[in-house]
Amino acid sequence: MKARGRAWKYGDNIDTDVIIPARYLNTSDPKELAQHVLEDLDPEFRYKMKPGDIIVAGENFGCGSSREHAPLAIKAAGVSAVIAKSFARIFYRNAINIGLPILEAPEAVERIETGDEIEIDFSTGEIRNLTKGEVYHANPFPEFIMEIIKAGGLVEWAKRRLAK
Amino acid sequence: MTLIEEILGGKSGESVVRRVDLVYAHDGTMPLIIEAFNKVFATVRARAYIFFDHVYPAPTVKIANLQKEIRDFAKRHRIPVIEGQGISHQLVVEMGLTENSKIVVGADSHTPTLGALGVFAVGMGATDVAVILGLGKTWFRIPESVGVILEGNPSRYVMATDVILHLLSLLKDYDMNYRAVEFFNVPFSLDERLTLTNFVVEANAKTGIIGEEYTGDGYVKELEIELNSLNPLVAKPHNPANVVPVEEVEGTKIDQVFIGSCTNGRFEQISKAAEILEGEKVAVRTIVGPASMNVYKRMIEEGVARKLIEAGAVILPPGCGPCLGRHMGVVGDGEIVLSTTNRNFRGRMGSPNAQIYLSNPITAAVSALYGEITNPEGAI
């Protein structure tokens, strides 16, 4: 599985309130949520991003509320992956559970700038910066998480457990 | 071995699958839980409760329909629904639901509040909670713990909120992600103990828990907090860890004060604020949100509600209130709020152009009287 798109870079502590403000939580329709993705951080984001683009951020991405609407909004907007130095734990679980690819890659975050063309190979964790001609590596997922990802998300993982 | 390692039965860093003794959700997170649940499961195999606290009673048809959907689901699966009686975390405590429980999961990030009762309680998202409903269990990565030992007793203007704000500034540059905080030697009442474990989430802690005796064995870090030397603190916009002494922001004009929420909406906290407002008039919009109907009832019985009403405050029905900007007390463009809640992220309470400051209920009440952020020391 691969992803390719332009990078949009933000800072540390991007919280779920700016990813999807609570005033838009009166729906669980991903398309509706996507219309407000990152609205309080960068109101232009949803107009300037193209499907496949990649969000790059610093430490503790997705901190705050447990709302699964946050990764849903990002995924439904067409973002192909989020690369961060670290993720807040509930967001980390939520993203994996709903199948939004996330990568912890501090070195990549240091180097990538907004507008860089990025290609990610999820099977190897290799992140290629086509603009700068550089290659970075994401931290590998713990074995347990890999099991869930390989199953295709938590719902599928649970189905298999039930079948046992 | 830390308290949490003992409860989860393993060493920090390990991932384990464990039975969940109690799982709960609210009107805000239930719709996505139902969606995920229905993809895989037919039967609920967990001890579950649902609370309507985020946007209750329903202000729009859309929300009324979502709540109807939740009721239908709950009825089908025989899950109790508690509507409008207060905030989930507070009600779990009041209803004694954690008795005989060691592991609790809530579909809300402030579920760790229950750690004040010595249980391991964590917040999770909708899909995780749906799977817990269906399987009765889930996986946990056993966190490393930071031991926080309190010493002495706080002065009369210092509350549990200040202990956490102080802790947030101590841990600002320390990586708390996936780690927990274990508190020891806590001199507070239950009302205030719940504030500690509720608010510690904002340090990015996975959870907080209060223990009896500190062994010192197995902790990644140890912190001592001298309560006697603490002074009232304030978190500036737009992050709870943006902490300064109240003097530094004294004189900041405010448009709204909110006293309440799962952080500071219990009887002790609201009555402390009411003592300050008694016989006075507030200078700005002042909203009080009891954490539960029991708190509200006691406020009426003990004359606290009268003091607040006569001072000009508006008392909301029990629930999350203005904390998350979805229902009552939403703030407008450019407005400045002083709130006793736990989050001051941009846009949290309404307009993304509003500014939210956080403080303890005493500072909030005194500031309501002056219409600006005021140091309670010297002012009362």
UniProtKB/Swiss-Prot annotation, chain A:
InterPro entries: Aconitase/3IPM_dehydase_swvl, AconitaseA/IPMdHydase_ssu_swvl, IPMI_Swivel, LeuD, LeuD/DmdB_bac, LeuD_type2/HacB/DmdB. Heterodimer of LeuC and LeuD. It is an enzyme of class 4 (lyase). Catalyzes the isomerization between 2-isopropylmalate and 3-isopropylmalate, via the formation of 2-isopropylmaleate. Gene3D superfamilies: Aconitase, domain 4. GO terms for molecular function: 3-isopropylmalate dehydratase activity. GO terms for biological process: L-leucine biosynthetic process. Its EC number is 4.2.1.33. This is 3-isopropylmalate dehydratase small subunit 1. The lineage of its organism: Archaea, Methanobacteriati, Methanobacteriota, Thermococci, Thermococcales. The gene is leuD1. Keywords: Amino-acid biosynthesis, Branched-chain amino acid biosynthesis, Leucine biosynthesis, Lyase. Pathway: Amino-acid biosynthesis; L-leucine biosynthesis; L-leucine from 3-methyl-2-oxobutanoate: step 2/4. It catalyses: (2R,3S)-3-isopropylmalate = (2S)-2-isopropylmalate. Belongs to the LeuD family. LeuD type 2 subfamily. It comes from the Archaea. It comes from Pyrococcus furiosus (strain ATCC 43587 / DSM 3638 / JCM 8422 / Vc1).
Swiss-Prot record, chain B:
Its cofactor is [4Fe-4S] cluster. Pathway: Amino-acid biosynthesis; L-leucine biosynthesis; L-leucine from 3-methyl-2-oxobutanoate: step 2/4. InterPro entries: Acnase/IPM_dHydase_lsu_aba_1/3, Acoase/IPM_deHydtase_lsu_aba, Aconitase_4Fe-4S_BS, Aconitase_4Fe-4S_dom, HAcnase/IPMdehydase_lsu_prok, IPM_dehydratase_rel_enz. Its EC number is 4.2.1.33. Catalyzes the isomerization between 2-isopropylmalate and 3-isopropylmalate, via the formation of 2-isopropylmaleate. PROSITE patterns: ACONITASE_1 (PS00450), ACONITASE_2 (PS01244). The keyword Lyase applies. Heterodimer of LeuC and LeuD. Keywords: 4Fe-4S, Amino-acid biosynthesis, Branched-chain amino acid biosynthesis, Iron, Iron-sulfur, Leucine biosynthesis, Lyase, Metal-binding. [4Fe-4S] cluster binds at residues 262, 320, 323. The gene is leuC2. The keyword 4Fe-4S applies. NCBIfam families: IPMI_arch, PRK00402.1. Belongs to the aconitase/IPM isomerase family. LeuC type 2 subfamily. Binds 1 [4Fe-4S] cluster per subunit. It catalyses: (2R,3S)-3-isopropylmalate = (2S)-2-isopropylmalate. It comes from Pyrococcus furiosus (strain ATCC 43587 / DSM 3638 / JCM 8422 / Vc1). GO terms for biological process: L-leucine biosynthetic process. This is 3-isopropylmalate dehydratase large subunit 2.
